[in-house]
Structures are given as structure tokens and as C-alpha cells.
Amino acid sequence: MPTSGFVRSTGVFMMAPSAAAKTPITIRLCGPRGFCAGVDRAIQIVVLALKEFGAPVYVRHEIVHNRYVVEGLEAKGAIFVEELDEIPPEHRKQPVVFSAHGVPKSVPADADERNLFYLDATCPLVSKVHKQAMRHHRMGRHVVLIGHAGHPEVIGTMGQLPEGAVSLVETVEDADVYMPPDADNLGFVTQTTLSVDDTAGVIKRLHERFPNLTAPAADSICYATTNRQEAVKQAAPGCDLFLVVGAPNSSNSKRLVEVALRAGAKKAVLVQRASEIDWSTVGDISMVGLSAGASAPEVIVNEIIEAFRDRYDATVELADTVEENEHFLVNRELRHVELTGADMAFVNGE
């Protein structure tokens, strides 16, 4: 690793610090990290809708689980609501965007009833899970959904099928006691943002109890979740402190904290901004790991690096695993709209 000059990693430029009377530390920066293709697409849909239709554009639920992103979109004219009945009658000709996490079938049906124009920003990989669940159901199987109760993605997936057609299993302990309506006719799908290792344990236990359990045609856990967890696994050993940039309601970010601890980090913490770091508890450190959940923008990663540089003689070590090139198209209604350089910087989390 050079001791001076610029080092570039996924859009981040880092000036290696000159010698100073500060404690030297290394920041091990994971790659890939931050925005995935589904998050990028969802944010882009809201920005494009604002350019095409003007403010306000309503968004049902946080478009992605990150306050920095949500507040940035609010500043541009987006209004976030939890339910469609919060949209005032005088604004019902304005578009409403469904979040990247997906929605139950009842939500677009409700929008149609209210004569609302909606744009679905559901991540295509979440939509794939919906299709997998519906295929199990068409084949006459009861669907087991491995996921976290109350998460918007789980609510959306369960809402694709009639009530009672899906059972939620969260843990190996749940799998131990689960009693299906027909043990010989089961199919499973998973939430896309789970711990890869934890999910494998749940699936293994379900297969032990129900040998005829049918897997989906393709893995439900998304590429970005898998890649970020693998990068953290490789970077965490030897870290005195591991920071994950992400929101407390971000499933994939919380899983990264768990992965870091299991992989050998002495301490792992979830933070939304550099201002949340409790420096009084950091203690003696020489190696810091840093990653970001799939809905966390790169600008906050840079903010945290600079916060460490203010206090330490920090050198950044890149811990890249795989390169991500995935890209998802936005809705047809928006493909003709052009974004400025500033728009793209926001969409890319810069």
C-alpha cells in the first residue's frame, strides 16, 4: 500500500496522510460495499419521476432504508407516506412510487381503486422471489418463507399469496418446531437480505425434517447481500473495530455487523453517520474494518474515513473481493428522461 498519493476505490479518492503525531491505524475498506443495483434503480425512479412529473412525488414507505437518502429525496420534492390513504385528494394525479422492498398485491389494487398512477420500484430480485413463491403455490405447495417478521420485504412476499398460503420461519429454532399443513408438499423461498450462513442452517434443518421440501429454481438471497457478506468475512479477522454504515431498520446492514463479529472482529458497530461514532468507547485500535449496507451511500463512507483521519494517522487498505456490474432498467414510463451529472451523483450516493 503506498504511503503517499492518491488511491482510488469504487469512486472514493483517498489521500494517504503524511506523518503526524497521531496514532497510526489502518482502515480496511471492504469492496463491494454500499448501493446495489436494486437500490440504485429505486432512487433513480424517484428522481426521474420528480423530473418528469414535478413535485410532489409520493413514495409509499422509505424508498430504501437510509435516512440520508430519504432526506435528500424529500429536499427534491418527494413525500413519504406509509399508506396510500395519506395522499390528499388534490394530489391524486401525482405519481406514487412503491419502495424497493416490494409490496403486497393489495397495495397496487388499492392504488387502482383510488385511481392513482403508481410506479413500482420493487427490486427485480425481490420480484423474482415473489414469482418463486407464486410458482410453489401454483404447484400446490405450501410456501415456507425464511425471513424476519415485520420487514417490508417479508410483508410484500407474504402478500403475494392468499392468507394462510405462506408460513414464516425465522430461525433454526423455528424450523425445529414448525408444523406444516402437509409435510410432503412444501416449497421454500427466502428474504433477499439474510445472512447467507444463518439461512443455510435454517434450510438444512427444514430439509432434515421435511425431505420433500422443494427449493426455488434459483437462490433467493441476492448477489449484493452475498458479496458484501463475503467481503466482510475476509476483512474482519484482526480488526479491533468494524464499522458498518447502515440504518437500524436495514436488514442487510445488520447482518453485516453479525458477520463481522463471527469472522473475528473484536467489536462491530452499525452507524448511520460519522457523528454517531462514540469515540470514548473506541479504545486502543490499530486495525479498523469499514463496510456499508446496500442502501448506504458512499458519501457517508468518505465522511467516516475523514472522521478517523481527524483523529488518527490513518492509512486505507482496500479489501476488494469481486467487481459488481449489475444494472437494472427503470420503468418504461421513465426511460426517456435524462438525468444531469448532479442527479447521477445523488443516485450513485456520491
From Swiss-Prot:
Isopentenyl diphosphate binds at residues 65, 101, 151, 250-252, 295. Catalyzes the conversion of 1-hydroxy-2-methyl-2-(E)-butenyl 4-diphosphate (HMBPP) into a mixture of isopentenyl diphosphate (IPP) and dimethylallyl diphosphate (DMAPP). Acts in the terminal step of the DOXP/MEP pathway for isoprenoid precursor biosynthesis. Pathway: Isoprenoid biosynthesis; dimethylallyl diphosphate biosynthesis; dimethylallyl diphosphate from (2E)-4-hydroxy-3-methylbutenyl diphosphate: step 1/1; Isoprenoid biosynthesis; isopentenyl diphosphate biosynthesis via DXP pathway; isopentenyl diphosphate from 1-deoxy-D-xylulose 5-phosphate: step 6/6. Keywords: 4Fe-4S, Iron, Iron-sulfur, Isoprene biosynthesis, Metal-binding, Oxidoreductase. InterPro entries: LytB/IspH (IPR003451). The gene is ispH. Its EC number is 1.17.7.4. Belongs to the IspH family. The lineage of its organism: Bacteria, Pseudomonadati, Pseudomonadota, Alphaproteobacteria, Hyphomicrobiales. Dimethylallyl diphosphate binds at residues 65, 101, 151, 250-252, 295. It catalyses: isopentenyl diphosphate + 2 oxidized [2Fe-2S]-[ferredoxin] + H2O = (2E)-4-hydroxy-3-methylbut-2-enyl diphosphate + 2 reduced [2Fe-2S]-[ferredoxin] + 2 H(+); dimethylallyl diphosphate + 2 oxidized [2Fe-2S]-[ferredoxin] + H2O = (2E)-4-hydroxy-3-methylbut-2-enyl diphosphate + 2 reduced [2Fe-2S]-[ferredoxin] + 2 H(+). Coiled coil: none annotated. GO terms for molecular function: 4 iron, 4 sulfur cluster binding; 4-hydroxy-3-methylbut-2-enyl diphosphate reductase activity; metal ion binding. Signal peptide: none annotated. (2E)-4-hydroxy-3-methylbut-2-enyl diphosphate binds at residues 65, 101, 151, 192, 250-252, 295. It comes from the Bacteria. Its cofactor is [4Fe-4S] cluster. Binds 1 [4Fe-4S] cluster per subunit. The active site is at 153 (proton donor). [4Fe-4S] cluster binds at residues 36, 123, 222. This is 4-hydroxy-3-methylbut-2-enyl diphosphate reductase. GO terms for biological process: dimethylallyl diphosphate biosynthetic process; isopentenyl diphosphate biosynthetic process, methylerythritol 4-phosphate pathway; terpenoid biosynthetic process. It is an enzyme of class 1 (oxidoreductase).
